[in-house]
């Protein structure tokens, strides 16, 4: 056992929660990605703090893996620690119309549990295949709703192990972004202020959202969700389609014929294929319409096309 593996085992007693050289394509919705040096399932804040301390001592990069649904990982993979939040980070506690939820909880699971209790405000999240923490950091949204509308407070753990409670103003919500993006902040818990609502109406609204998703998105192929953010006053998908790029292909990566702001994996696509195609789409749209699209997907590892 390597010295690093031994140190990880001193923190994570269950060896089944530590995987070495784990291919990340197994953990991303687009089914692309090279190996992580270590993929570690973290069950509580104590483990997380100790892992962050270890990473700081060893100068290791740290990545937080949610559902892997809006993520492209380089073919070379990533160095350091990839952490998946489980255990206490997936819990949901309801007190009246206030919900406390861990950053590792699934957004669709949370939306459905809220509706079953007659709590509204999260219907938009039923079709967003991500976690609460990732959704907060990018201010995920759909169907006219977003995280900014429901978040009352967030507890984050910084890369140096400090814990801090943040109000919405400190989080800095904006369209598909917050001030937490690009920082070391890890979302441990979120407090949400929901509203009492009719359960049948909530479930009906969510059925509509899910049916619309099935009708408009290429769910039959692995994909990473919306590739580009919508520019002000327009839609990325419309611009890409008007540029004649539906069906455009690099290797096994293809601009979806169903929704132009999705890139699908036809079978053996690589991260290089996807990022080369994204760059081609961005360049073509900018040349045709004078609009420079901004990536919505997160990109880990080697990435000369879309630098942070």
Swiss-Prot record:
Its EC number is 1.3.1.98. Its cofactor is FAD. Pathway: Cell wall biogenesis; peptidoglycan biosynthesis. It catalyses: UDP-N-acetyl-alpha-D-muramate + NADP(+) = UDP-N-acetyl-3-O-(1-carboxyvinyl)-alpha-D-glucosamine + NADPH + H(+). It holds the Pfam family FAD_binding_4. Residues 31-197 form the FAD-binding PCMH-type domain. One of its GO terms (molecular function) is FAD binding. Belongs to the MurB family. PANTHER family: UDP-N-ACETYLENOLPYRUVOYLGLUCOSAMINE REDUCTASE. HAMAP family: MurB (MF_00037). Cell wall formation. This is UDP-N-acetylenolpyruvoylglucosamine reductase 2. The lineage of its organism: Bacteria, Bacillati, Bacillota, Clostridia, Eubacteriales. The gene is murB2.
């Amino acid at each position: 056992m390597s010295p690093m593996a031994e140190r990880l085992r001193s923190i994570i007693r269950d060896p089944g929660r530590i995987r070495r050289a784990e291919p990340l394509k197994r953990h991303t919705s687009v089914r692309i990605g090279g190996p992580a040096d270590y993929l570690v399932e973290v069950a509580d804040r104590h483990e997380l703090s100790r892992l962050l301390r270890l990473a700081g001592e060893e100068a290791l990069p740290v990545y937080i893996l949610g559902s892997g649904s809006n993520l492209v990982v380089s073919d070379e993979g990533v160095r350091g620690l990839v952490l998946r939040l489980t255990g206490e980070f997936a819990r949901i506690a309801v007190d009246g119309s206030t919900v406390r939820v861990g950053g590792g909880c699934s957004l669709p699971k949370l939306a459905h549990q809220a509706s079953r209790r007659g709590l509204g405000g999260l219907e938009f999240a039923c079709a967003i295949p991500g976690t609460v923490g990732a959704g907060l950091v990018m201010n995920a949204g759909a169907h006219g709703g977003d995280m900014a509308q429901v978040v009352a407070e967030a507890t984050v753990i910084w890369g140096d192990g400090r814990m801090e409670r943040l109000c919405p103003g400190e989080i800095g919500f904006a369209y598909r972004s917050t001030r937490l993006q690009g920082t070391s902040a890890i979302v441990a818990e979120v407090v949400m202020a929901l509203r009492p609502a009719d359960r049948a109406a909530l479930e009906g609204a969510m059925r509509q959202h899910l049916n619309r998703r099935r009708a408009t998105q290429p769910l039959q192929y692995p994909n990473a969700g919306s590739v580009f953010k919508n520019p002000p006053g327009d839609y990325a998908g419309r611009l890409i389609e008007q540029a004649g790029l539906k069906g455009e292909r690099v290797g096994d990566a293809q601009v979806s014929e169903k929704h132009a702001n999705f890139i699908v994996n036809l079978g053996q696509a690589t991260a290089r294929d996807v990022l080369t195609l994204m760059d081609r789409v961005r360049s073509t749209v900018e040349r045709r319409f004078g609009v420079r699209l901004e990536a919505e997907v997160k990109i880990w590892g080697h990435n000369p096309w879309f630098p942070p």
